[in-house]
Regions:
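Short acidic, glycine/serine/threonine-rich loops at helix termini
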Residues: 18-20, 64-67, 167-170, 194-195, ...
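C-terminal active-site/capping subdomain that shapes the small-molecule cofactor and substrate pocket
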Residues: 38, 273-380
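Short catalytic-loop micro-motif centered on adjacent basic/acidic residues
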Residues: 129-131, 155-158, 181-184, 212
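Rossmann-fold NAD(P)-binding glycine/threonine-rich loop
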Residues: 134-150, 158-179
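Rossmann-fold dehydrogenase core element
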Residues: 172-185, 206, 210
């Protein structure tokens, strides 16, 4: 029982995902694996993930075996597993808006003819397509989403292009009878999840959150790409929503700054996050909190993607269509409906057991409940 997976964008995140599947291929059901909810996730284990095709536009990756491409060109994440030859050639995908100006300074675009993505997905009998395209790839990501619908495979949208959380696109997936888990992958323990937890802690302990910022620096191609500020709009919206949605009162946008800040080449795939929260406590006395988080960026989300892929396959098996609500809320920054993280995890556990499904009726109920609780809700 395998999950046939395709990858769009063979960068650092794809490298960590492929390495992770190799690294944990011999685990047992009772093993506690860092970064995964369960080794056995609804009947699917890590070793059940099988990479069958991949797409990229980098001349140094196209035509290579996936095992080689994950270490090629500008990829600079940490190596933690030796990946054998997979017999999976990286194919030339369509570019669209996938290459920003800084990307074009660093890589050579392949001169090979782009393939018909939907046809490849059909030919390879792909179950789940994972999109790892660069931030700002609006047209390119939506083209891959359309290809997934055309081919009848599930889609995991790891970047901040609003598809699962966009009403029009969510309906397209429902009409096509195809599930989507999205949008914008969370890390295992990253800047967004820690910021969310502490913002919620302030409110739970009666501290009014007045102002906050989150500044991120890193040395991978993602951070270089985001130097082009025109590609950042959806990223900033996604990260900001993820934090402010757990705060019950409206925050003045002037008092919230969350987003990537700069590129520091020598950090490689490490990310440093600097976060500050300013609040008001008893007696209108100020209370301030600052912290710094250091992570290897790509491995920090790879386990989450493994769980998201398995959730997408379960949804496919159950013939669900449109946004898969519980997994999207737990694994993604910008889902159709936000839940507090503990509640989202509980819903995923119920989803695994088949007690919660991604139905339109459930979506309506979740939205109504969230609005009644005063949450910032956006609905697909």
């Amino acid at each position: 029982m395998s999950i046939r997976v395709a990858i769009a964008g063979v960068g650092n995140c794809a490298s960590s995902l492929v390495q992770g599947v190799e690294y944990y291929k011999d685990t047992k059901d009772e093993d506690k694996i860092p970064g995964l909810m369960h080794d056995n996730f609804g009947g699917y284990r890590v070793r059940d993930i099988e990479f069958v095709t991949a797409f990229d536009v980098d001349a140094l990756k196209v035509g290579k075996d996936l095992s080689e491409a994950i270490g090629a060109s500008q990829n600079n994440t940490i190596k933690f597993a030796d990946v054998p030859n997979l017999g999976v050639e990286v194919l030339r995908g369509p570019t669209n808006d996938g290459l920003g100006e800084y990307y074009r300074q660093m890589i050579e675009e392949s001169d090979a003819e782009p393939v018909d993505v939907a046809q490849v997905l059909r030919d390879k009998k792909v179950d789940v397509l994972v999109s790892y395209l660069p931030v700002g790839s609006e047209k390119a990501d939506k083209a891959y989403a359309q290809a997934a619908m055309d081919a009848g495979c599930a889609f995991v949208n790891c970047l901040p292009v609003f598809i699962a959380s966009d009403p029009e696109w969510a309906q397209k997936f429902r009409d096509a009878g195809v599930p989507i888990v999205g949008d914008d992958i969370k890390s295992q323990v990253g800047a967004t999840i820690t910021h969310r937890v502490l913002a919620r802690l302030f409110e739970d302990r009666g501290v009014r959150l007045d102002r906050t910022y989150q500044l991120n620096v890193g040395g991978n191609m993602d951070f270089m790409n985001m130097l082009q500020r025109s590609r950042l709009e959806s990223k900033k919206i996604s990260k900001t929503r993820a934090v402010t949605s757990v705060v019950p009162h409206e925050m003045d946008p002037h008092n919230v700054h969350i987003g990537p800040s700069d590129y520091v080449a020598w950090l490689d795939d490490r990310k440093f996050a600097f976060v500050r929260l300013e609040g008001t406590t008893f007696g209108d006395v100020p209370l301030n909190l600052e912290y710094k988080l250091e992570v290897w960026d790509s491995p920090n989300s790879a386990g989450i993607v493994i769980d998201a892929v398995r959730a997408a396959k379960i949804a496919l098996d159950r013939h669900l269509a449109g946004p898969v609500l519980a997994p999207s809320s737990y694994f993604m920054k910008s889902p159709a409906v936000q839940h507090e993280d503990g509640e989202a995890r509980r819903l995923v556990e119920e989803f695994i057991k088949g007690e919660v499904e991604g139905t339109e009726e459930q979506l309506d109920a979740d939205v109504a409940a969230a609005k009644a609780a005063g949450k910032d809700v956006w609905r697909a």
